[in-house]
Swiss-Prot record:
Quaternary data: The DNA polymerase holoenzyme is a complex that contains 10 different types of subunits. These subunits are organized into 3 functionally essential subassemblies: the pol III core, the beta sliding clamp processivity factor and the clamp-loading complex. The pol III core (subunits alpha,epsilon and theta) contains the polymerase and the 3'-5' exonuclease proofreading activities. The polymerase is tethered to the template via the sliding clamp processivity factor.
One GO location term (cellular component): DNA polymerase III complex
Full protein name: DNA polymerase III subunit delta'
Function, in words: DNA polymerase III is a complex, multichain enzyme responsible for most of the replicative synthesis in bacteria. This DNA polymerase also exhibits 3' to 5' exonuclease activity.
Top-level taxon of origin: Bacteria
Top-level EC class as recorded in UniProt: transferase
Gene behind the chain: holB
EC number(s) from the headed UniProt entry: 2.7.7.7
Amino acid sequence: MNWYPWLNAPYRQLVGQHSTGRGHHALLLHSLPGNGEDALIYALSRWLMCQQRQGEKSCGECHSCRLMLAGNHPDWYVLTPEKGKSSIGVELVRQLIDKLYSHAQQGGAKVVWLPHAEVLTDAAANALLKTLEEPPEKTYFLLDCHQPASLLATLRSRCFYWYLACPDTAICLQWLNLQWRKRQIPVEPVAMLAALKLSEGAPLAAERLLQPERWSIRSALCSGLREALNRSDLLSLLPQLNHDDAAERLQWLSSLLLDALKWQQGAGEFAVNQDQLPLVQQLAHIAATPVLLQLAKQLAHCRHQLLSVVGVNRELLLTEQLLSWETALSTGTYSTLPSL
């Protein structure tokens, strides 16, 4: 697994707590997606299970380290949903607990990693609580979570909370620039900055967004919006939005609306879409502040419905949203869309 320079400090702090006897058996790691959190948890797991630690590093040579490197350590448990399911049910947790109360096969620590703790059902989380309160000897739980507020409060209270902050912008841009130079792919600095801001400062998420195929989709959407505004035909965006990635594409549009609001308030230097400033200015000039605010709220609500409502009619939802947007921009008035 790759390692990233911004993880050095949090890794040393977490390992330092364990090496001095202050480490908690249950870690709740809160991070934005694409910040390297899986690499940090993997490195901490290796250190906890290493049989010949070298200070804050795992040795890489002992039998436990070799098993971890091979990806088949019998005392390292990765708890994820079963194939075809989106949540971790109570039966999976019970099976795990039964294994944890048996002797470690390698005679050392046992480590459980939950890559997305928020997908635990309430019943599964409750089943895990008792074990978190009284864990088997030398057993560690590493919970990775992007939305800790969605976890049961009782589960959060049993864990040591750690927020993995995104690195400074300068560090992120330096790292991104290095990645694209290695691949000999030219990427404009303004594009890297925009991708980083669209990813809320998470460098790995920004790197994925900058992949030529994905970045070209965003560029095409921005071009399509510009043409749609010129023709007063927002519905023409429907083919570009009606896609499995609709939620992300709506987020891109929302960021443009919010940038237009910033521009109207004289705060254009804080715009997210630094590579699309002419489009931001166009939006700022054709719509009043109240209209932009309402459209941004409607887009956020539309996105929430796409992500949370099972079986929602995506095409109908997007069509109503675009027609409402078209009316608002042409008349300066807006309506409140009904909830589907």
